[in-house]
């Protein structure tokens, strides 16, 4: 039980399972806070951000790049035992290379006309 997170890159006409590249995280609560802030900024309810495929834009990835490089200092998770909030600083440090790999892959994919998605399950 807990927070599982996924991101993938695919061609526009491909299904989710026909992705070109993917990555996953486990209980990376600060990444979740960041992604949830995008979801809410788009006019969605915070409570609805579970098991939803959210397409990310180049602007989203630019913001994510900044968040990663600052250890998500503006996206501290205040609660959420099952999200791993109690060890969120360590999770951000441990995921740093993976997060940057995702950022780089996402920028490259968008430049090539591919789509980038994020989803979570908790």
What function would you assign to each model-found segment?
Residues 1-114, 120-122:
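Acidic (Asp/Glu-rich) sequence patches and key acidic residues
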